[in-house]
Amino acid sequence: MRTLTLKHLRATTGRSRDAQPVPRATLLTTTACHLCEDAHQELSRRAGCGELSLEVVAVESDEGRALVATHRPAMFPLVLLDGRPLGHGRLSRRRLDAALRSGKVR
């Protein structure tokens, strides 16, 4: 397990500049996965903007195996928002936008 570390406070602490909690995205990735790379790039960008905090978990890790056992994704990556499945496979930016706007992720 590793937390994405950016120079921005909000990316590592899970708080925006005004100290409001932001949703926590967990990205479960595997090797040689272009969809994982795409999701990582988009979620990293959003973490840098303060929309969310990002934790990247490798499927080979203990935490990754536990997430696979719990959520049984059909394909990778698996994206969780505050511990709840947002989707697997290609990241739906529309679904992510809707979840962030609704405020129902917490």
Residue ranges and their predicted role:
Residues 80-106:
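Non-catalytic, surface beta->alpha helical segment in thiol-disulfide oxidoreductase systems
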Residues 38-41, 66, 91:
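Generic recognition of short, well-ordered alpha-helical segments
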Residues 1-13:
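N-terminal "domain-start" segment that seeds a small globular fold
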Residues 71-79:
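Structural micro-motif
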Residues 10-49:
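Local sequence-structure signature of Cys/Sec-based thiol-disulfide redox active-site neighborhoods
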